[in-house]
Amino acid sequence: MKIVVTGAAGFIGSNLVKGLNARGIDDIIAVDDLTQGDKFRNLADLRIADYMDAGDFYDRFAEGAFGHVEAVFHEGACSDTMEPDGKYMMANNYTLSCNLFRACQNQNTRLLYASSAATYGGSDTFSESPEFEKPLNVYGYSKLLFDQHMRRELGMRFENAQTQVAGFRYFNVYGPREQHKGRMASVAFHQFNQFQADGKVKLFGDYGGYGPGGQMRDFVFIDDVVAVNLWFFDHPEKSGIFNLGTGRAQPFNDVAIAVVNTLRQSQNAAPLSLEDAVRGGMIDYVGFPEALVGKYQSYTQADLGALRAAGCQHVFADVQSGVTAYMQWLSNAKN
């Protein structure tokens, strides 16, 4: 069974390869752009059949150069929500995805692709329906445009799909193998490094009607993202657009105190309440950056109705358990 993973050296892509390997699947073509060379580390401990540069792959795949491919996990994209170059964003996230979809349809290959919660943008309702889709940046728009293209081709719920097409609106994903992402890495990753360097972590202060560190997101652990992708891989009859979050909004303060207490525990120090951590100078609230005003989601919470209706009953980790596991992984990786 041949599988393609695009963005395979990236955060979610490499974890998908890891998840497939855990099932004994290694006939995997890993597709990426290794201009940022240190991303190779995400593939170094994994088993793949071949690697191909993204610049070469898409045309060759469309020509049928790889024989029958069972499924493409399409994670390759520009995921920088602050990227200002709209032409670059649309070429990478929209046009390329449209071409890949056509090639998959022509070859009877299943397509499981990364959409994004950024498609909702300024909405206060996070349900897979057009009236709630209000992107705040060109990244979110590029993802929404491809979802809209799929709806035109396959029907609103992809009910006309002859071969599986499933899009996943990832919420705030965090976990191992994101170290290459720079400013786009999760808050938990940055706070790990901040605490190691300075003994404190940083959060935004008041913004959007929320108090310091009170902005709320649906934080989802990478292992859960992989598990849901693989559930759909196991259920080829299921197509559509699905939110992939926990269904729980939690404040950034929850992430911060989980980081602080897990790292304190590794130093044999007692856990602290949020108030005590703030009082002790371990959580530092900073002014909200002007560049993000009007482009920032202060609240997200996935509506899991469509996911559950499809039959996926996966139980998601909360911030406390997921961030704790991640901090332990980062500590072990550093040592």
From Swiss-Prot:
Positions that bind NADP(+): 11-12, 32-33, 39, 75-79, 92, 143, 173, 181
EC number assigned by the record: 5.1.3.20
Pathway: Nucleotide-sugar biosynthesis; ADP-L-glycero-beta-D-manno-heptose biosynthesis; ADP-L-glycero-beta-D-manno-heptose from D-glycero-beta-D-manno-heptose 7-phosphate: step 4/4
Active site: 139 (proton acceptor), 181 (proton acceptor)
Pfam family, one: Epimerase
Gene Ontology molecular function: ADP-glyceromanno-heptose 6-epimerase activity; NADP binding
GO BP terms, alphabetized: ADP-L-glycero-beta-D-manno-heptose biosynthetic process; carbohydrate metabolic process
Keyword Calcium: no
Catalytic activity: ADP-D-glycero-beta-D-manno-heptose = ADP-L-glycero-beta-D-manno-heptose
Keyword Isomerase tagged: yes
Cofactor(s) the protein requires to work: NADP(+)
Protein residues bound to substrate: 172, 183, 190, 204-207, 217, 296
UniProt function note: Catalyzes the interconversion between ADP-D-glycero-beta-D-manno-heptose and ADP-L-glycero-beta-D-manno-heptose via an epimerization at carbon 6 of the heptose.
Domain comment as written in the entry: Contains a large N-terminal NADP-binding domain, and a smaller C-terminal substrate-binding domain.
Annotated protein name in UniProt: ADP-L-glycero-D-manno-heptose-6-epimerase
Naturally occurring in which organism (per UniProt): Polaromonas naphthalenivorans (strain CJ2)
Gene: hldD
